[in-house]
Amino acid sequence: MTNSAINDQEPAFIEVGSGDSQRKIAVRVRAGAAPGLIWLGGFNSDMKGTKALALDAWAAERGRACVRFDYSGHGESGGSFIDGTIGRWLEESVAVFEQFCRGPQVVIGSSMGGWMALLLAREIARREASPAASQASAVSQANRASLAGLVLIAPAPDFTEQLMWNQFTPEIQQEIQTRGVWLRPSQYGDGDPYPLTRALIEEGRNHLLLGSAIEVGCPVRILQGAQDPDVPWQHAFALAHRLPTEDVVLTMIQDGDHRLSRPQDIARIIAAVAEIG
């Protein structure tokens, strides 16, 4: 399966939210066997990146299901990036997972997508523990998506607080507080600055994870570059310490950067996915 063939997949669109907050989310679905794969991308990225396409190609070669999508304000989805918050993007992640995934899933989250994957796992655990879930029929339970495991690539849980707000100068914090937005220079993509809003920072505080144990109920594989300028390796260690001790593996790639998109990095990511299922 060539990358050009993968790119020719037409996206499906779903509506998430209601009223003024309704937005159209672009989803690409590859039918196949379980365990399926679902890709959760990073902040200000899209589902056509190197890692996402490589995973989709790997799934296609093995007849595995694969789901990719763009958050609102990203890629082919509707909505404005400036309106984005962690809760808003989590709502979209849950909607895509529930609508397009069936059976066990390997959730692969990159950077912010790592935070999304952890929040998604927590949300799934809450729903499975609900009285409604226990009363569901055997057929409906078999059709429901579940977690086979998480593969987290340079995961950035709590990044709005720990890696942004706490690292900003008082001048930048003041601008965000007073103007509601700060344009941050970017070293990726076209290099254009992108908006960081007060809403992103403040709403993100509703979803912080690193202050207590994180129960995900499945195996976790973490891949982290020691040379990552955006998510320091210490952040990955802090996350690993918050996860259950059983079946959590942290792989430190000594010469790896934030993107982890080199051929050798892709090979490690795919190996982690294959190890889970």
Predicted regions and their residues:
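N-terminal cap/lid segment of alpha/beta-hydrolase-fold proteins
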Residues: M1-G32, R262
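The serine-hydrolase catalytic nucleophile loop
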Residues: F43-D56, Q234
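Short beta-strand element of the alpha/beta-hydrolase
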Residues: A34-G42
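Catalytic nucleophile-loop/oxyanion-hole region of alpha/beta-hydrolase
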Residues: H74-C101
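Alpha/beta-hydrolase active-site loop signature
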Residues: N44, Y71-E76, P157, D257
